[in-house]
């Protein structure tokens, strides 16, 4: 997909960087899980809002992408998903309903027939409504898109960092199996390159 009005980095949401069967989604209350929650919070609060306009598809059509659609598209490139089934359901439904007249993700999920979904949505939305309307911060132009892009990159970076640690641990136990060691070293090098590319997009300096 291509957008004539955005930079090259934004024209191409994250490409196929992460091997499908290689990385694992966090299963506990870790920094990775917290980033997942922030992503789902963005979907619940702003899932219906358009952050990309005039995206050109392969067949020459143009479409707009909402927050939910962008996240679903980006994670779908590498078959990534959240560790919590509720999160995946929220993303799937928000992406499916985006573009429908009158759809508001927050109200939709707070009224969801599944109590597990509606309770989670209410929890994710609650701190927004603790502020009176006059004191609620306004999203600067382009701010929502940049926040969502950064969260998606953080999500991918955490997966990559975890995999690097896993490879390092495996290298310590590989013993005299030189073929396996070679495979692990090659994967470590490739994964480092992915990490460095993500770090550049995030504006981070990676210390080797």
What are these regions (language model features)?
Residues 14, 76, 85, 89-208:
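Bacterial replisome coupling helices
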Residues 3-102, 106, 121-134, 164:
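Non-catalytic protein-protein interaction segments used by genome-maintenance enzymes to assemble
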């Amino acid at each position: 997909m291509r957008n004539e009005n955005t930079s090259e980095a934004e024209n191409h949401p994250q490409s196929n960087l992460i091997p499908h069967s290689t990385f694992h989604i966090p299963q506990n209350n870790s920094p990775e899980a917290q980033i997942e929650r922030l992503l789902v919070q963005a979907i619940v609060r702003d899932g219906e809002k358009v952050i990309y306009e005039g995206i050109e598809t392969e067949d020459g059509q143009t479409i707009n992408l909402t927050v939910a659609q962008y996240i679903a598209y980006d994670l779908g490139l590498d078959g990534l998903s959240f560790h919590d089934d509720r999160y995946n359901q929220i993303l799937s439904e928000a992406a499916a309903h985006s573009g429908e007249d009158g759809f508001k993700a927050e109200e939709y999920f707070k009224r969801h027939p599944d109590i597990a979904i509606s309770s989670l949505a209410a929890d994710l939305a609650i701190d927004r409504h603790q502020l009176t309307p006059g004191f609620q911060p306004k999203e600067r132009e382009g701010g929502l898109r940049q926040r969502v892009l950064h969260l998606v990159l953080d999500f991918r970076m955490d997966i990559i960092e975890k995999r690097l640690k896993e490879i390092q641990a495996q290298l310590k136990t590989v013993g005299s199996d030189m073929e396996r060691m070679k495979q692990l070293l090659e994967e470590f090098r490739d994964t480092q390159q992915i990490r460095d590319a993500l770090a550049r997009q995030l504006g981070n300096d990676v210390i080797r």
